[in-house]
């Protein structure tokens, strides 16, 4: 992700904090964890007034939907019952919490989180290299020697090309000599791991979606809508309050238990498609993230399909 895109994403997070505070404080006590939002505020200050207004509109659009799904946000049990709004550190994602914004009521030991995205739908950008064991990192099953025997010579060559300062666009054989064999080795390795360990499908989705349930919030500027999507895999979302029930019901979604198919996308040498049971499917597109050749690549991982009981609502901007 470019520095510009990163700043836009952080600015959108800041706009959501502002809008949430404004809407919540009309009903009950709320504070912001100021230290947690320093980076987001810094990014906010780099945006134009037009951009700031756009982020605020995008943030405002989904809040009524959030409140209808989560009555515990507005419920108040006395003056000591205070909502805290905070932004997670980037390092939290490394430990499995993919939520960006967290809404907490410490008095009742309750919190929910939002994963914020601005104009993109990637589930994750995961790096591959000659030393990164994606199997161990993603689903706890180390990659086999047959995988390493294919990919290590490729990344060794890329390291040599980097030392010669070769640009990716000058590497005319990269699809056949780099992308295709790495994706092919990836496909064979995951299929091999699944044969040995049937829990791979659920572990993979847990790696991509984290250890806590959350709502994904995507601002789509061109359409002027904010997509609100539930990932209620453990039943942590949609809790009723003491006196108020949720008016928007969020069902629990089932994790996958089977790999139906893992293969190359038709007519592609750089993208794998994974089809699982219970409605899950994903694409893995390998790409370079730099101008000069380097001995690592990234997978742009996106959901092609999710279970029908993952609720998606398009919230129009005012």
Describe the residue ranges of each PLM region.
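Short, positively charged
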Residues: 1-98, 104-111, 115-318
């Amino acid at each position: 992700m470019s520095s510009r895109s990163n700043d836009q994403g952080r600015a959108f997070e800041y706009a959501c904090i502002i809008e949430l505070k404004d809407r919540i404080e009309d009903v009950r006590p709320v504070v912001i964890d100021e230290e947690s939002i320093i980076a987001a505020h810094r990014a906010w200050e780099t945006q134009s007034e037009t951009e700031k207004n756009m982020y605020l509109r995008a943030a405002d659009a989904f809040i009524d939907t959030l409140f209808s799904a989560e009555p515990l946000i507005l419920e108040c049990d006395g003056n000591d019952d205070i909502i805290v709004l905070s932004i997670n550190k980037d390092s939290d994602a490394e430990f499995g919490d993919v939520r960006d914004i967290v809404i907490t009521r410490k008095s009742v030991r309750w919190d929910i989180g939002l994963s914020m995205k601005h104009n993109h739908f990637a589930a994750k950008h995961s790096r591959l290299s000659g030393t990164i064991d994606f199997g161990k990192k993603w689903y706890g099953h180390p990659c086999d020697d047959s995988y390493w025997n294919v990919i290590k010579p490729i990344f060794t060559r890329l390291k040599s090309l980097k030392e010669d300062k070769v640009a990716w666009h000058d590497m005319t054989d990269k699809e056949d000599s780099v992308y295709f064999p790495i994706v092919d080795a990836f496909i064979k390795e995951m299929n091999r791991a699944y044969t040995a360990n049937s829990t791979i499908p659920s572990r993979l989705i847990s790696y991509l979606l984290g250890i806590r349930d959350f709502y994904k919030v995507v601002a789509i500027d061109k359409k002027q809508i904010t997509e609100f999507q539930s990932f209620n895999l453990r039943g942590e979302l949609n809790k009723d309050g003491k006196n108020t029930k949720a008016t928007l019901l969020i069902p629990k979604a089932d994790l996958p238990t089977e790999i139906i198919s893992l293969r190359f996308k038709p007519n592609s040498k750089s993208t794998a498609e994974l089809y699982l049971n219970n409605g899950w499917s994903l694409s893995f597109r390998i790409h370079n993230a730099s101008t000069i050749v380097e001995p690592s690549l990234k997978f742009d991982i996106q959901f092609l399909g999710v279970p029908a009981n993952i609720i998606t609502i398009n919230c129009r901007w005012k």
